[in-house]
Amino acid sequence: SEVGVLPEIPEEKIVKKWRLQPGKMLLVDLEKNKIISDEDLKDDLKRKHPYGGWLKSNQILLSDVPKEIGPMTPDEKSLLNLQKAFGYTQEDLKFFLEPMIKSGEDPIGSMGRDIPLAALSNKSRLLYDYFFQNFAQVTNPPIDPIREELVMSLVSFIGPRPNLLDLTSGGKQKRLEVDQPILTNTDLERIRRIENHLTGSFKTLTLSICYKKDKNTVDIDSIISSLCSKAEKAVSENDYNILILSDRSVDEDHIALPALLATGAVHHHLIKKGLRTDVGIVIETGEARRVHDICLLAGYGAEAINPYLSFYTLSNIISKSKINVLEDEASKKYIKALNKGMLKVMSKMGISTFQSYCGAQIFDAVGLSSNVVEKFFTGTATRIEGVNLKEIQSETEERHLNAFKNNFEYDNVLNIGGDLSFRLNGENHVWTPETIGMLQHAVRSADYSIFKKYSNKINNQTENFKSLRGLFKFKNINKPIHI
């Protein structure tokens, strides 16, 4: 792609000059001693099989499936309970969802993170917070998703996947195509009841990822194992080819498993049983609302995601605020913002299509025990130990209890959050009004003693808030090592 890499080649020996463009290829045929261009190469390949006919007979667009009536929107009290159960905060509404429906863009904040890691926080954290996105560490972006939009695609296929190496089985498996992986509540109902319109092509089964609240300790490991067994049986014995993992049945008596945990568990269980390519996985969850959440669900195997509670929350925001946006338009802008955010995340690793990103697991786990990672997020890098399954269960049940108990002081408001900026009763921060004021005082007065107080305060905070650096200590040994 670079001119001048091969210098001193006489012009009379050059037959043609061009650059290798994105999405294009060339073949050097050593037997025939010639270079085959992109156009000739693809012309030869496309004539070998009736690909167009296969697509026409087996590729089904979700937009062509008739609409179905979805569940009713919950009342305001029920909506608030659901938001609390799934860990929504006032910051989520004000700094994420509201800007999304105003601009259709993924909100951008300042750099820098001065809050504890999820595993070291004394606040209840969602499982998504224990994962960090990987990125290609190069000086220029691997892909520019804006200027190289031509090679970017969020198209997803739901259902069984054909063997890419077996060209004799073409046209035998139906594929359900969606132009992007975020499903509205109406779209999800289309998939749930797809047998009403496409007899014999797809069979959809909804598996609840909720479990009944019990006074005694619930064994969450056995609940996940039961969920995986149901998924395996549905595919291997009953020929279901679309599974919907749903937490819609959450209520005062039923607690939802973290959607990411359920997704990773079922995805890897089906892989181990050799059944994953026989079925598509769709997630119906009230927990996911941000780009990071959606990327994690997709990265651990979800071909499509329906963040139903986000859509209900958008409707509530519009009804209460002065935002002049219709409900349908707000949903479209929210989906647009999520899509742009996903393209940005994919491009950081040089991935251009959602189909390549789905199940790729391009994350590091930080603060999860190796047992949890090995069992439910197999193959994910984890550098330190951390919380186990019981602690994840405890935090989930704590949020559920706070959502449905009668607490008159905070009954009608969401938790303030405090991740993005310092708030009383919010998440701990290293940079607080006290430390910032102390630094300003030290600089303006040029008083070293005040600066020492400031530095001691910062150092104490890194230990108290348990940052990894703050926990680092040298170990004294009795026998020095000779160097």
Pin down the residues of each PLM region.
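Flexible, glycine-rich loop/tail regions that form catalytic "lids" or insertion modules at the edges
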Residues: 1, 5-7, 15, 34-221, ...
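Conserved, mostly hydrophobic/aromatic
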Residues: 26, 247, 266, 297, ...
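Short, ordered loop/turn segments at secondary-structure junctions
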Residues: 31, 248-250, 286, 302, ...
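Active-site-adjacent beta->alpha loops and helix N-cap segments on the catalytic face
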Residues: 252-265, 313-323
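Catalytic cores of alpha/beta
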Residues: 287-301
